[in-house]
């Protein structure tokens, strides 16, 4: 089983969008028994809160199913239990390192790296642009799934 953890600041916008999008495309590919997907935050600010309404609205618009969930903070155990920890931006990477330490197993990847880009996935909490975030998330998840399919 390949395990993917999407990580952003609060676990209510970008990482949850990525979690639900990835679950959707994994299911469509018939790989739900082979790929496990979850998400978490680097901060504690939104712990216990559900997915942001803007993320839900965009997922609804795109026909991506989601469920009620509670934001949670990433842990050291997550580093050991997941194969891929996908960060949305450089700040997530710095904050994740404070929690898990060094990435000795090379499991941490920037989301846009899967499409050959080094830039961040912009946070719609600040930009208000859930369309742009969805475009980045969907492109990076599609590419990540193709990479994983080659390995399983």
Regions found by a protein language model. Give the residues of each.
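Conserved active-site segments centered on acidic
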Residues: 1-80, 146-152
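Hydrophobic structural packing positions in well-ordered secondary structure
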Residues: 8, 59, 86-87, 137
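Helix N-cap/beta->alpha junction signal
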Residues: 15, 89-90
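Phosphate-binding/catalytic loops
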Residues: 84, 90-152
């Amino acid at each position: 089983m390949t395990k993917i953890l999407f990580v952003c600041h609060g676990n209510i916008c970008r990482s949850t969008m990525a979690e639900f999008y990835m679950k959707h495309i994994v299911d469509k590919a018939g790989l739900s028994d082979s790929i496990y997907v979850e998400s978490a935050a680097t901060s504690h600010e939104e712990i216990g809160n559900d997915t942001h309404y803007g993320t839900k609205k965009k997922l609804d618009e795109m026909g991506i199913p989601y469920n009620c969930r509670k934001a949670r903070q990433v842990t050291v155990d997550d580093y050991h239990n997941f194969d891929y920890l996908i960060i949305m931006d450089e700040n997530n990477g710095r904050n994740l390192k404070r929690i898990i330490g060094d990435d000795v197993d090379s499991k941490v990847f920037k989301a846009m790296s899967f499409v050959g880009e080094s830039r961040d996935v912009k946070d719609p909490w600040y930009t208000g642009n859930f369309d742009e975030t969805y475009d980045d998330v969907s492109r990076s998840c599609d590419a990540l799934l193709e990479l994983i399919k080659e390995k399983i």
